[in-house]
């Protein structure tokens, strides 16, 4: 709820210290580097990282516990793979996130949007504080309570705060099967169709559904009519140019998106050095239009490829040179 409260108060650039700043109680003894092998902390860290992936800033930060991915295991193990999956997803969504950041800066939008901001006519969402929209397309329903291990910290009440004996509950020698399937309930706002981000399964809005999850899955749903640009897998933000982007289109309603780009590492955008590419989906004609590029900046891509992917897996690729072009499905 804190992030949503900040956004509602006009402060969109909110984040948290993923994994908790002070997390030493999860070590067997002070600074012994054991917390990253402690199942209670592993589950907490993965779920927190998943939530942080859909924060304005994604930052793993703290003391007492080493947060490097290799501290949690190795490739092929569930905890390591879950962490790697989220890091990769954050990077691949940079075109969507960066464009959303421009909406925040230039059009007074917000990253984390309480559901009532976009679905005010659905009274059921007015009091929902554990789901939110990330940008205007992706509904995020973080798993905030332990599913595989005991809850380590218990909130007694608003007056008394957190349980003082919580530290006693932060250690366990019990084996945990992080491959086991769990489930959680999610409410999807009324008035639109929703697609499961991971499976593309379609759902009617205005209903509570049960989502089966494993440790590596955070429930995500995409609103019908959404256009989500996806970039390449990279090790750092500017490692590769956006010369070939995938445009994920979720049919069912009309939709639009503005792809924003600039020099990425300075304030020249304040002087007008940036571009916008308007993209729209007409659901009746099943046509995607990539509009004429507006603006310019030094070193911008003059030509690129877009691969358009519908939620049913249908794909078409087009070459784009800055002039309007349409793709019909």
Summary of predicted features, one role per range:
Residues 215-324:
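Accessory, solvent-exposed terminal regions and/or long lumenal/extracellular loops of proteins
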Residues 179-181, 206-207, 320-329:
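Solvent-exposed, conformationally flexible loop/turn segments
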Residues 1-216, 222-223:
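Catalytic-domain carbohydrate-binding cleft regions of carbohydrate-active enzymes
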